[in-house]
Amino acid sequence: MILLISDLHLEEERPDITRAFLDLLAGRARSASALYILGDFFEAWIGDDAMTPFQRSICQALRELSDSGTAIFLMHGNRDFMLGKAFCKQAGCTLLKDPSVVQFYGEPVLLMHGDSLCTRDESYMKLRRYLRNPLSLFILRNLPLRTRHKLARKLRSESRAQTRMKANDIVDVTPEEIPRIMQEYGVKTLVHGHTHRPAIHKLQIGDQAAKRIVLGDWDRQGWALQVDENGFALAPFDFAPPLALPHG
């Protein structure tokens, strides 16, 4: 059994999401041969050299799962594209390129975060190309920590404001991109996150049936895609209620 998740946006301010993720690691993920995290795992990441105690605790939890025998694969999202080799080494996970083709029970499956499919959002695509440039990444990683914190806050604030202003079809994937990239990589199944619109879309590419699976974001509930010999099952799950404090 294989599990895929994305868009947890982990941060200290959302202990409910953190608790649900740790529960997943201690529960279902222990039975999985692999766990794939397809981007925006953290709400923000300014560099492996700037890990907070909270982020270190998440890193340690991943390491414990990895040491138990579950392989962990991590892909960059638009919020945590500065996650690097040092974090992955400590966490015991493998950094996946976006996009990547993997084999699930004999079927090639294309995995992506999903932001690169939103080609109608021209201003974002321009920013993405700039930020993902190796020279830009080198400069960003070598800025003073205070500057990186300020820049991350600015980018998050602007992203939220622009997302609210833009039409839904602009911030969603470009329909024409889906068959194009699936044909380019020779797959009949695409799995991605980013859009926060969980669904399994049935497609027709040429004369073949295909599908696009969109993972859900973790906000009021969690989402996970389970893959096994019977196929793909996308389902939400409720967060466990917070522990009640004893009275008196």
UniProtKB/Swiss-Prot annotation:
Keyword ATP-binding: no
Gene Ontology CC, one term: extrinsic component of plasma membrane
EC category: hydrolase
Residues involved in substrate binding: 78-79, 121, 159, 163, 166, 194
Sorted UniProt keywords: Cell inner membrane, Cell membrane, Hydrolase, Lipid A biosynthesis, Lipid biosynthesis, Lipid metabolism, Manganese, Membrane, Metal-binding
Residues that hold Mn(2+) 1 according to the record: 7, 9, 40, 196
Catalytic activity: UDP-2-N,3-O-bis[(3R)-3-hydroxytetradecanoyl]-alpha-D-glucosamine + H2O = 2-N,3-O-bis[(3R)-3-hydroxytetradecanoyl]-alpha-D-glucosaminyl 1-phosphate + UMP + 2 H(+)
Cofactor binding notes: Binds 2 Mn(2+) ions per subunit in a binuclear metal center.
E.C. number: 3.6.1.54
BP GO terms, sorted: lipid A biosynthetic process
Reported cofactor(s): Mn(2+)
Gene3D superfamilies tied to this protein: 3.60.21.10
Family, as annotated: Belongs to the LpxH family.
Name of the protein described by the UniProt record: UDP-2,3-diacylglucosamine hydrolase
Protein's organism: Pseudomonas fluorescens (strain Pf0-1)
